[in-house]
Amino acid sequence: MGAVERTVLTTGANSGIGLATAIEVARRGFVSVAGVRSPAKARSVARAAKAAGVKVRTVMLDVTDAGDCKRVMTELKPYGLVNNAGVPASGAIEDVGDEEARVAMETMVLGPMRLARLAIPHMRGQGGGRIVNISSIYGLMTTPLTGWYQASKHALEALSDALRVEIAADGIAVVLIEPGAFRSNIWESAGNDVQRRLDSEYFAAYRRVEEGIKLSQRLMGDPIEVARLIASVMAAKSPKARYLVGYDARAIDIYAKLLPTEVRDRLARITLGL
């Protein structure tokens, strides 16, 4: 089966890593399908694909909606699934209510696993496939003020590690992508979260985070770097279990492994004024 016959579905594909991935897998000869949540986002994807000179189909897909997931996966029967949909889920544990936490876990844990469950029988029947889960360097460590986001990525890491072994004999590779900071609309969303927490005990710390994001945005990587890796994973005979992407991800990984927990805690408190 050639790449041109293989369908790859990318969720959360209207911007950032998702959009870059949908375009790049199309460029590599796969049938690329972008999952989006609104007609406006579908039009945005169509414009970007046209500008890139590739064909990307869009489907309406809310990964937290079981009916949506079943409909799309039954129709597409994809060779490749890229679970990229996400929400910022920022805020101190004390500030994040049940509904925000639920949305984070449904979007970034339950949704990806639901899609994977639906994809596996089709992939098994086709003789193999690829499930690529977009985690984060913060799926390997934890910092203050984004605990629920990081909890979702830690959960995604654990579930991916279990699933990888469970379905390896079926020729289905489960791959974790662990990026650092790459340009995406999610950073703007995180900034908006700060404005919603004006009365928080942690507002001064949120301001420091917001200022840090603004200062670092020009240093953030181009999402095409991640997209090219994902496209290569789709074509690889034996992809690795996980890939760190970005100089900052590699640096943070070393930092997390070398420094004792107490030292990391102290540095975080000093940096954020906690």
Segments (PLM) and residue ranges:
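Conserved glycine-rich cofactor-binding loop
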Residues: 14-15
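Residue(s) in the substrate-gating loop at a strand-loop-helix junction
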Residues: 136
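C-terminal beta-strand-loop-alpha-helix "lid" module of Rossmann-like NAD(P)-dependent dehydrogenases
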Residues: 169-217
